[in-house]
């Protein structure tokens, strides 16, 4: 199945996915660094639970998203696999947070539901047959 709209040989879906993932990665890297820098200031503590853990988690998540997004853009199988793995992790971690079960300390409950919806959308798109074929994932 060929997309009618392409950019540099990539379907519109891949272009949208990489732009969105790039923005998600940049925002998380920025906030991860900001939270690490501001963590020593009591006024900036996001959660009473170990703010350093959430800061490092946010930074690491952002960096992984950026790395795997570059793989998606370059049509690399590891980009697809990494994006799927990170998306599944986010769904699980945020679902645990919403259920008040042990998860990453400091994940804001207000952000969990939108992150789950976004991650499930990414997983739905990446699981489509034409995308799996592009990244040489067995169907």
Task: Enumerate the language-model features and the residues they cover.
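Topology signature of small-to-medium multi-pass alpha-helical membrane proteins
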Residues: 1-139
